[in-house]
Every structure is written in structure tokens, then in C-alpha cells.
């Protein structure tokens, strides 16, 4: 059994008479301290913070004056002292605590203002290991945890963004903090130190190249609360972490309504897909609905790529997401606004394009400043009942694979180009996934089926339907190529591709019936390439 608590009444309003300020980020601290001073609050501070406040003309007592002990070991030890921690932890209504505080000359601290050494920023800056270690804050987290534990009497502020929040409370209660406020600040404080320690543990694991540490932590700060989740009866919020990856999380919303839960999920899927296409080599557009592509294409211009992608399935594209690997231009913007679109995401957008999009006030336009690197590693997490599944990001790129021609006929140059295009796309389609492609554009996509043959049939059928809507007399799958996200367990999927008129196929290989599938390809004159890499997506 743990420590048994003694019970004392907790005051609702507690006056702030004494504050300790020790901040790494000095933003706003002078104005905050000045406001506290106006309430006759005694100011105690440390090192650099004390100097900043003194330079501003504020009466500040250095922590060394309180403890009677100087900062030592390059500032590693300055607040780790009974006169500080006793002041933070003392239970004012406990007679034994009161006696101890009086005996040792401990005067309670009613408010702690601390933000920590910038560990994450330093660890991501390319600094050497010793510099990173020096930016692990010790005294700060110790004080934060102490003050938060004793929130019955002590408020704790860990974020610059909370300064105005606290000052409004002090104004409302004439220099006092309410218990509900102190409790809320305590919750934020523990979340802050937990995230800080998680970042340190993550850095150690990465530095030691431990891919599966014994304890894995995920943390983020609240960016915004959404109206609802996937469905109106579900609550949702977005928490931001410190990953520096271009995408929806770091994008600027130039216009339109706030992004919904589904918008963010779909937009992330769209931008990750279009990032498979190197903007230095090609121009590409992806159209996404429910996190699945309904059309992807390359073109000589964004307009051409967009129209080719739209041709794949213009019905499903209605109300979807448009992702571009190049800055949105005027010509493409004029085409996009012709149908209802939820979100456009691109590295940037020209002034003329922005003016066109502004005609649709609810259309969301996001710019990211760049594309995510599809080769970059990272973790992907999925929550389960009672746990979290964690895996590395699928960062295999078709350009880096050793493609093996396994049939008698090798793909032509045009077929190989389309095969690689299709394999880029199929990586981002929910399994089981089949993609038909022709002339650097998808013409049919089959997604999320329990059997591969069904995905193949659906992809061909959707291509036929799109051709009929466009008034075409021949199915676009004639002369197309096919990509599969996983191997064909039987030859039936390949035969469905033959029936649709495909001439070449790309797949991972690895089935116990590979020879049967290869023989079927040879019998029908198909060229087939094995990649050796599977792209399941769930």
C-alpha cells in the first residue's frame, strides 16, 4: 500500500503572495511579472530569469538569497533545496507541516512559473550528444511536479500561453486563484512533464538504435477540438507532435472552414500519396475520398494531371480532396472549382489561384511549403483494445526496388513507366488493392475488398463505367497495366486483368503459386514484374 493521506479542508480561493519564476523561454515573462507585482506579489527568480526581471526594474529576490546556497555545477544545482521544495510542498493546514516550515524558515510559494530547457528543439537541431544531455532539465520538472502535487495551495504555470489565462483569474478573484484553476493547471503541468520525459526517452532509444524500447510513449499538445469525429456522435480533437514532416498538421489554412476529423484523415492520405511523385521530375495530382484514391495522374501541367485523374472516377471525386505535388496555379484552380471539393492541399498557391479559390468561400486551401519525403522513416501507431500497435512507416519507394522481370516477355519502356506509376499508387490504396493505369494515369481502382479477385473485377468495372460516362467506345483498361499491393494467391486475379485487356502486371511475388501465375501470364503474352515488396494498407 502507498502513502496514507491525511485529510484537510482545501481552500477554494488561495491568495498568491509569493511566486517563483524560472523560465527558459523569456517571452512575456516581464509583463507577467509586472502584473503579479501590481498585486503585491513577492518575486523570486533564478539566474537568467532574475536578470531579465531586474533589468526591467522589478524587485526580485534571487533564489540563492532564499536558500543561502549559491548555484553550483554550471547551474545544474540551484533550486534543488529544502527551502524551495518545502515551500512548494508544504500543506499549510497540516500542523506538523506548519511547525516544520516555521522551524526551518520556509515561506510558502503560492505560484510557480517554469518552462523547461528546450530539449526537443536541441535534440532535433543536429547538436552533439553532450549538448543534448545538458538540455535535459532537472530542477524544473522537480519543482513542477512538487507544485502540481500540492495544487491545494500552489498554482503552477508551464506555458507562456497560460499567462493571460492566469492573470484573468487573478483579476476575477482579486489576486487569488480558485481551486478549480489550480487543479486544471496541475493537470497541464503533469501532462507537460510526461511529454518532456517521453521526448527524452525517445531520443535515447533513437540514439541507441533501439526500435522497440521496453516502454513507448506518444505525446502531443492540443491543436484544436473538432465539431465531431468520424460520425456526429463521436468526439474528436487534433493533437500536434513535434515531427517536422510537411503535411496537413503543419499546413497553413489560407481559406475555408476549419478542417473536420475526416478532412484531416483524407487530406493526410492524399498528400502522402502525391509526395511519391518527385516534383523535380514530374507534375502529379491525386484525388482522394475516404482515404482511398479515386484518381491519380501525371501530366505536363497541373491542369492536365488533374483532368486525367478526374477521368478515372469523376463520381467518387465529388466532395473529395485534391492533392498536388506542385504549387497550385490559375489554370488548375479554374478546373477544380467546377465541382464540389472539400480540400485542396499543395506546397504553395499562386496569387491568381488563391483569388479563384476564394470564389468558393467554404473550400479549404492548405499550403505546406514542401512535400514529405516518402523515404523518411518514422512510427505509425494504431490503438487496440488494451494496447497500441506500432510499426515503422512504409517508406519503400518503387524507384529503389530491384524489379525482376519473371515472364518471357519484358515490359516495354512505356509499360515499365506505367507499372512504376501504378505501384506508387497501389501503395496508398486500402488492401486488397488493384490499380489499372495507362499513360501515367489511373483508369480503374479496386480497394478494400476481402479477396484480390474482387478488387480486380471492381477496378475493371469502375473503369468501364467511367468510360461510358465519358462517351468512350473502348474501355480504358485495354492496353493498360496492373499493380497489386500483394501477391496473387491464384492465377484468377491475373486472368481478370487479361480479360480487361491489360498487357503488363507488377506485384510483390512470393506466393507458393507464383509459377502458376507466371505460366498464366506467359500463356497470354503478359509481361510481369516482381518487386519483392508488399504494400498492405489497413
Swiss-Prot record:
Superkingdom of the source species: Bacteria
UniProt keyword terms in alphabetical order: Hydrolase, Multifunctional enzyme, Purine biosynthesis, Transferase
SUPFAM superfamilies attached to this UniProt entry: Cytidine deaminase-like, Methylglyoxal synthase-like
CDD domains: IMPCH (cd01421)
Gene Ontology biological-process entries: 'de novo' IMP biosynthetic process
Domain MGS-like: 8-158
Enzyme Commission identifier(s): 2.1.2.3, 3.5.4.10
Annotated GO CC locations: cytosol
Pathway recorded for this protein: Purine metabolism; IMP biosynthesis via de novo pathway; 5-formamido-1-(5-phospho-D-ribosyl)imidazole-4-carboxamide from 5-amino-1-(5-phospho-D-ribosyl)imidazole-4-carboxamide (10-formyl THF route): step 1/1; Purine metabolism; IMP biosynthesis via de novo pathway; IMP from 5-formamido-1-(5-phospho-D-ribosyl)imidazole-4-carboxamide: step 1/1
Listed InterPro entries: AICAR_Tfase_dup_dom_sf, Cytidine_deaminase-like, MGS-like_dom, MGS-like_dom_sf, PurH-like
Record-linked Pfam families: AICARFT_IMPCHas, MGS
GO MF entries: IMP cyclohydrolase activity; phosphoribosylaminoimidazolecarboxamide formyltransferase activity
Gene3D superfamilies: 3.40.140.20, Methylglyoxal synthase-like domain
rRNA-binding keyword on record: no
UniProt catalytic activity: (6R)-10-formyltetrahydrofolate + 5-amino-1-(5-phospho-beta-D-ribosyl)imidazole-4-carboxamide = 5-formamido-1-(5-phospho-D-ribosyl)imidazole-4-carboxamide + (6S)-5,6,7,8-tetrahydrofolate; IMP + H2O = 5-formamido-1-(5-phospho-D-ribosyl)imidazole-4-carboxamide
Recorded domain comment: The IMP cyclohydrolase activity resides in the N-terminal region.
Family under the similarity heading: Belongs to the PurH family.
Protein name, entry field: Bifunctional purine biosynthesis protein PurH
Native source species: Bartonella quintana (strain Toulouse) (Rochalimaea quintana)
Gene that specifies this protein: purH
Amino acid at each position: 500500500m502507498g502513502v496514507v493521506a491525511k485529510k484537510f479542508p482545501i481552500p477554494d480561493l488561495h491568495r498568491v503572495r509569493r511566486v517563483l519564476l524560472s523560465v527558459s523561454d523569456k517571452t512575456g515573462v516581464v509583463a507577467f511579472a509586472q502584473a503579479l507585482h501590481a498585486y503585491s506579489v513577492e518575486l523570486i527568480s533564478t539566474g537568467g530569469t532574475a536578470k531579465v526581471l531586474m533589468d526591467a526594474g522589478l524587485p526580485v529576490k534571487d533564489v540563492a538569497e532564499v536558500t543561502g546556497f549559491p548555484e553550483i555545477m554550471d547551474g545544474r544545482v540551484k533550486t534543488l533545496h529544502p527551502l524551495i521544495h518545502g515551500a512548494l510542498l508544504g500543506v499549510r493546514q497540516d500542523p506538523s507541516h506548519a511547525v516544520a516550515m516555521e522551524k526551518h524558515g520556509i515561506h510558502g510559494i503560492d505560484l510557480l512559473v517554469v518552462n523547461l530547457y528546450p530539449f526537443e528543439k536541441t535534440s532535433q537541431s543536429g547538436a552533439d550528444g553532450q549538448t543534448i544531455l545538458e538540455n535535459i532539465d532537472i530542477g524544473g520538472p522537480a519543482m513542477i511536479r512538487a507544485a502540481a502535487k500540492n495544487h491545494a495551495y500552489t498554482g503552477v504555470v508551464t506555458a507562456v500561453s497560460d499567462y493571460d489565462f492566469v492573470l484573468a483569474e487573478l483579476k476575477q478573484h482579486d489576486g487569488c486563484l480558485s481551486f478549480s484553476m489550480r487543479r486544471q493547471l496541475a493537470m497541464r503541468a503533469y501532462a507537460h512533464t510526461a511529454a518532456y520525459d517521453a521526448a527524452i526517452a525517445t531520443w535515447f532509444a533513437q540514439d541507441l538504435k533501439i526500435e522497440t524500447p521496453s516502454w513507448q510513449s506518444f505525446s502531443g499538445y492540443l491543436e484544436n477540438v473538432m465539431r465531431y469525429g468520424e460520425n456526429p456522435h463521436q468526439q474528436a480533437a487534433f493533437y500536434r507532435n513535434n515531427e517536422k514532416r510537411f503535411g496537413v498538421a503543419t499546413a497553413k489554412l489560407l481559406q475555408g472552414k476549419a478542417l473536420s476529423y475526416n478532412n484531416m484523415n483524407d487530406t493526410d492520405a492524399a498528400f502522402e500519396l502525391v509526395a511519391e511523385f518527385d516534383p523535380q521530375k514530374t507534375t502529379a495530382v491525386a484525388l482522394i475520398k475516404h482515404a482511398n484514391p479515386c484518381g491519380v495522374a501525371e501530366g505536363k501541367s497541373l491542369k492536365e494531371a488533374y483532368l486525367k485523374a478526374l477521368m478515372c472516377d469523376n463520381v467518387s471525386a465529388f466532395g473529395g480532396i485534391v492533392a498536388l505535388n506542385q504549387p497550385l496555379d490559375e489554370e488548375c484552380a479554374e478546373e477544380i472549382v467546377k465541382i464540389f471539393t472539400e480540400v485542396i492541399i499543395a506546397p504553395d498557391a499562386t496569387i491568381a489561384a488563391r483569388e479563384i479559390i476564394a470564389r468558393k468561400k467554404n473550400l479549404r486551401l492548405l499550403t505546406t511549403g514542401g512535400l514529405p519525403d516518402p523515404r523518411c522513416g518514422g512510427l505509425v501507431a494504431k490503438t487496440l483494445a488494451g494496447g497500441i500497435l506500432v510499426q515503422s512507416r512504409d517508406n519503400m519507394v518503387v524507384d529503389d526496388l530491384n524489379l525482376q522481370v519473371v515472364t518471357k516477355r519484358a515490359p516495354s519502356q512505356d509499360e515499365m513507366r506505367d507499372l512504376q506509376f501504378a505501384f506508387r499508387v497501389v501503395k496508398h490504396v486500402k488492401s486488397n488493392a488493384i490499380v489499372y493505369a495507362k499513360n501515367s494515369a489511373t483508369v480503374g481502382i479496386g480497394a478494400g475488398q476481402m479477396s484480390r479477385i474482387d478488387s480486380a473485377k471492381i477496378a475493371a468495372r469502375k473503369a468501364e463505367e467511367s468510360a461510358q460516362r465519358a462517351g468512350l467506345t473502348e474501355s480504358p483498361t485495354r492496353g493498360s497495366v496492373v499493380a497489386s499491393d500483394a501477391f496473387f494467391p491464384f492465377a484468377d486475379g491475373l486472368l481478370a486483368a487479361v480479360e480487361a485487356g491489360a498487357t503488363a502486371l507488377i506485384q510483390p511475388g512470393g506466393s507458393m503459386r507464383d509459377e502458376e501465375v507466371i505460366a498464366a501470364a506467359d500463356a497470354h503474352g503478359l509481361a510481369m514484374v516482381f518487386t519483392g515488396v508488399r504494400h498492405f494498407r489497413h
